[in-house]
UniProtKB/Swiss-Prot annotation:
Family: Belongs to the NAGSA dehydrogenase family. Type 1 subfamily.
Chain's gene name: argC
Catalytic residues of the enzyme: 149
Subcellular location: Cytoplasm
Name under which the protein is recorded: N-acetyl-gamma-glutamyl-phosphate reductase
SUPFAM superfamilies documented for this protein: Glyceraldehyde-3-phosphate dehydrogenase-like, C-terminal domain (SSF55347), NAD(P)-binding Rossmann-fold domains (SSF51735)
Organism for this UniProt entry: Cereibacter sphaeroides (strain ATCC 17023 / DSM 158 / JCM 6121 / CCUG 31486 / LMG 2827 / NBRC 12203 / NCIMB 8253 / ATH 2.4.1.)
Protein role: Catalyzes the NADPH-dependent reduction of N-acetyl-5-glutamyl phosphate to yield N-acetyl-L-glutamate 5-semialdehyde.
Record GO cellular component, one term: cytoplasm
């Protein structure tokens, strides 16, 4: 049976990525698209690359009839999703791609996002959407919170190592490079071509990046005690992709073995042979994650390198993977597209 889908916030990058992926999904049909500032426009006017698809026109959220919608993807900006989702029908399944429901503790949300949560009752209901680690909870969920793209990349590299007890929990460093599409589609001076090209820079350094809240929450939960990592992201002049270099104290072979065993049966995660390192070019446009492990010149230390596409596995692809579970579909449905190369 085909499931009817609404995409709220379809005029942004993650919304367009949802449309691109669902276009070839065997069991999903897009019946509504919202884009309040572009209401009335065709998606092909906003994103010409979608011109060949037969899609509904963009409309305001309040104009959508949700009575025939099975699941809604909410690709609205952070701090906007809270009020919108609170106003949706209570029996409607929702996958949220914003940061609004990722942190379970209302106090933690206020710490990292600077204001109280507008829908704390939904915050407690939401299931964290790192699919490979929360499958059972996601299957029975009404509201799933998509992870941060940087947070997902780091967790894929580190979670199995904490679970296996093969690293020092007090010495974890994440050095991450991210593509510019992760900053969204709105006009910003620092994202202009002349400002961004031919250079790279750290941002939200010194423990200020909001995805640290997700690392704290998830790693501490696994370890059963507080775990804090050092994390610095860098903006790089590429459209898509994230590369995380994760430095840990632990035997490199044990680190590689723990990751290999944990992801052995996972469709979208591949651990490369020991010593081989991944590249963002090899996962571009796909829902795949590649992970490599190498030893360090310092004995007893290892580096884990993880790459994913921030718009796909880091956001919209992950959202569809979660929606598949929520709707009782094949988890990998619609997500088998090969990476784009070159």
């Amino acid at each position: 049976m085909v499931q009817n889908i609404a995409i709220l916030g379809a005029s942004g990058y993650t919304g367009a990525e949802l449309v691109r992926l669902i276009a070839t999904h065997p069991a999903m049909r897009i019946v509504a698209l919202s884009g309040d500032r572009k209401a009335g426009m065709a998606m092909s006017e906003v994103f010409p690359f979608l011109r060949h698809l037969d899609l509904p026109r963009l409309q305001k959220i309040e104009e959508i009839d949700f009575s025939s919608v099975d699941l809604a993807f909410c690709a609205l900006p952070h701090a906007t999703s809270q009020a919108v989702i609170a106003g949706l029908p209570r029996d409607l399944k929702v996958v949220d791609l914003s940061a609004d429901f990722r942190l379970r503790d209302p106090a933690a949300y206020e710490t990292w996002y600077g204001k109280p949560h507008a829908a704390p009752e939904l915050q407690k209901e939401a299931v964290y959407g790192l699919t490979e680690f929360y499958r059972d909870e996601i299957r029975g969920a009404r509201l799933v919170a998509g992870t941060g793209c940087n947070a997902a990349t780091g967790q894929y590299a580190i979670r199995p190592l904490i679970e296996a007890g093969v690293i020092d929990l007090d010495d974890i460093l994440i050095d991450l490079k991210a593509g510019v599409s992760g900053a969204g589609r709105s006009l910003k001076e620092n994202l202009l071509h002349a400002e961004l090209s031919e250079g790279t820079h750290a941002y939200s350094a010194g423990g200020r990046h909001r995805h640290l809240g997700e690392f704290d929450q998830e790693f501490s939960k696994i370890a059963g005690r507080p775990v804090q990592v050092r994390f610095t992201p860098h903006l790089t002049p590429m459209n898509r992709g994230i590369l995380a270099n994760v430095y840990v104290k632990g035997d490199p072979q044990a680190v590689h073995r723990a990751l290999t065993e944990r992801y052995l049966t996972e469709t979208f995660l591949e651990v490369l042979p020991f010593g081989a390192l991944p590249s963002t070019r090899d996962i571009r446009g796909s829902n795949y994650v590649h992970i490599g492990v190498i030893g360090d010149r310092v004995p007893g230390c290892a580096m884990v390198v993880a790459v994913l596409d921030n718009l796909c596995k880091g956001s919209s692809g992950q959202a569809i993977q979660n929606a598949n579970l929520m709707l009782g579909l094949d988890e990998a449905a619609g997500l088998g597209l090969a990476p784009v190369f070159p």
